[in-house]
Amino acid sequence: MNDDYEMRYYELTRERFGLSYDVDMLVDSGRLYLSTFYNQYDDEELRWKDEYGKLGLIDGTDTATGMQTDRMRHDAETRVRYETRTLSAVTFGFEGNVGGWGIDPMLSYSFAEEDDSDNADVTFRMDQKDTVGNIDWSNPQQVIITPTDLSIYDPAQLKFKELEITENVSKDSELAFSINAEKETDFGIFKMGFKSKNREKDVDDYIIVYEAETTMADFDPQTLDWRIPGQTFSPQANPDLIYGLRDQLDSLDVDFSDSLSRDFVTEEKVNAVFIQNTYSWDKGVVVAGMRYEDTSTDSSAFDQDGNVVLASSDHSFFAPSVNVKFFLTDQWTLRGAIWRGLSRPGFKKTAPKLDYKDDDGDISGSAGNPDLKPYEATNYDLSLEFYGDDMTFVSIGLFRKDIENAIYPKIYKTATFLGVTFNDDVETWENADDSTIDGLELNLQYGWENGIYFAGNITLTDGESTFSPADGMSFTTPFRKLADEAANISLGYDKGPWDIRLAANYRSDYLDWLSDEGDDIDDVSENNSRFVDSYMQIDLTAKYKISDSTELKFEAVNMGNEEEYYYWGDESQLSQYDLFGRNYSVGFTYKF
């Protein structure tokens, strides 16, 4: 097993405020419109973490169901966080006819900000180097760790290790312009368009760590009834007192500060053009076109010494597409498509930046990869559909995806990035060579006159990716985060003011990581790869329409109290076990 084990408890409160305003004005040749919206999310989070690290195996004590350890480094961590996220956008456009062409020019601006600068995170530590502890994994989903010396739980023995304060403000802005024009000709409806998008992401991430000579006993220790029977969750510091340390920073000693290494700015410019023609006749429709886009990205960040690090990339993408719909009868339709798709990596993955932590000489973290390429796919789709009376619908579909540059996380046990030598794992990202996904999809929907309806869907897939490390060897893995089986079944009632839906959603297990914290990706195997176990969730949604403007809504999520389980290689090797509980909400919508 890994040499550390941790339990976490979360309390999260979220408040959301949203406002939208739209204006339409009719003119001689069409319609002018202005659309605006503003959303604000305020999160309040408490996290208690109870961690036992540096677990050393006593020779000869390991069995199929447990082991004994001769060392436990106990960390009890209390984190309090208040975060505000805002998102606003304004769009101005026109839709109408000019010179026989239908046009729709649009100019938009959006701005998002995430402010996570109001927080406090304190770790208390006790290191028992000569005390035996027992670890029982007879139930691999609920491992039990039992120290023989209970003083490891004593708040007076848990010394104040550090107070970590972070000030993270992330700003994301985008200015976009697009215009499309279409005209009906003898060969169908011809359409062409242009879009230009300029986006900037600016992350200012400051961290400062303080020390103090005190123990948890001075912070009103709290106890928690843990959900796993037989397992003790250590006392934790009062979150109000932890957050109150923000008013006492002048009395604390600064141990470490970093105002640069996590900062970065990325600017992305995308220009795209397309042409498309839609041809229809009594037996079908053919839509054919092509799209070309050019993307340039410029990033700046800092190395360990505060020197500016620059990175740039340019990428062009050509995407032809053909979509065919053929009406076999009034009720049967055959569809086929060949098209290209593109997905760009996130800015945090491509910026030349570091995010690292030094824990008494154990340096871990993550590093961006400016050489990361966008994910490209050629897609093939074929389906047969039946449209019956009312809600009756049946379909069967086949699909294939030929993928280039699929993006995977990669873990190095030791490596050096931007002058920082990591010796306790560093995560970065890497492109695979070629990947393929083949799939089959079945859909069924049927409704009765009394308002009751049934819907079901099942998708079967088979995907894999190929890697070629620097040593010239190659290996193949399952496609990441792709479940071989996925299905959902819904039973509902939709008539009059009532809209009720009971749904069950299922997926099989899938690959999450290619290697664990002790192995590099070049040594990948099933035993050191992380998987997510199969999962089924049952949800209920009920809506009642009081009037045209007012609607009541009730939601029950995860009614079966399903847990999420992650494991290394096989289900007997725990990686992570999450209990979310059931969630209920009541709300109403009013339109005016």
What are these regions (language model features)?
Residues V27, Y38-D42, T86, V98, ...:
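Transmembrane beta-strands of outer-membrane beta-barrel pores
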Residues D4-E6, N39-E45, K159-E164, N168, ...:
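Signature of Gram-negative outer-membrane beta-barrel scaffolds
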Residues R400-D402, T414, G419-E517, E555, ...:
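Gram-negative outer-membrane beta-barrel transporters
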Residues M72-L87, R262-K269, L342-S395, R400-I403, ...:
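Outer-membrane beta-barrel signature, preferentially recognizing the C-terminal barrel domain
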Residues M1-K54, D75, E83-G93, G99, ...:
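Transmembrane beta-barrel wall of Gram-negative outer-membrane proteins
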